[in-house]
């Protein structure tokens, strides 16, 4: 809308990005990956489309401990971005498996209170398990 010719927005599934291999400088994602049932595929496809040296910049929720079944299986909590959160360790493992380097996962503990209020009556203890986080990674140079 502002006439920038160096930015492109595309609509597609996060597990199957409608972008050519090695063509993107950066991928930005805000609170979406936790909703995917196949997070490894998300990170693998992000790696595929990034140019060597390309960056992944994510803001999402991560679990600081394994989620109890009642949180994982609650549809309200799943759709509220709580029930599908991967642990910090699992997120790092998936990024490494996809091929990323220079991985940083920076939890924001101050988000716990807000997350506990997302689904009134249901997410009261969600902040005990889930926090917002900045996730950064780089596709290595060839």
Where is each model-derived feature located?
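A short acidic, Gly/Pro-enriched loop at the edge of an enzyme's catalytic core
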Residues: 5, 15-26
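C-terminal lobe and adjacent flexible extensions of AdoMet/dcAdoMet transferase-like proteins
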Residues: 94-142
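A short glycine-rich, Lys/Arg-flanked "PGG" loop and its adjoining helix->strand segment in the class I
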Residues: 40-55
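A short SAM/SAH-binding and catalytic strip from SAM-dependent methyltransferases
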Residues: 14, 25-38
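Helix-to-beta-strand junctions that scaffold the AdoMet/dcAdoMet cofactor pocket
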Residues: 3, 35-37, 50-52
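Class I S-adenosylmethionine-dependent transferase superfamily signal
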Residues: 31, 45-47, 95
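Short, conserved SAM-binding/catalytic segment
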Residues: 1-7
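Short, glycine-/aromatic-enriched active-site segment of Class I SAM-dependent methyltransferases
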Residues: 62-82
């Amino acid at each position: 809308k502002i006439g920038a010719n160096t930015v492109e927005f595309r609509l597609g599934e996060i597990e199957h990005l409608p972008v050519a291999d090695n063509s993107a400088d950066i991928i930005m994602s805000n609170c979406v990956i936790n909703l995917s049932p196949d997070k490894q595929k998300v990170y693998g496809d992000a790696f595929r489309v990034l140019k060597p040296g390309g960056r992944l910049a994510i803001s999402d929720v991560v679990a600081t401990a394994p989620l109890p079944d009642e949180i994982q299986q609650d549809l309200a909590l799943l759709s509220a971005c709580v029930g599908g959160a991967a642990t910090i360790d699992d997120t790092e493992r998936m990024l490494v498996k996809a091929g990323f380097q220079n991985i940083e996962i920076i939890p924001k503990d101050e988000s716990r209170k807000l997350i506990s209020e997302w689904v009134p009556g249901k997410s009261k203890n969600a902040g005990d398990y889930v926090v917002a986080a900045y996730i950064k990674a780089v596709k290595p140079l060839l």
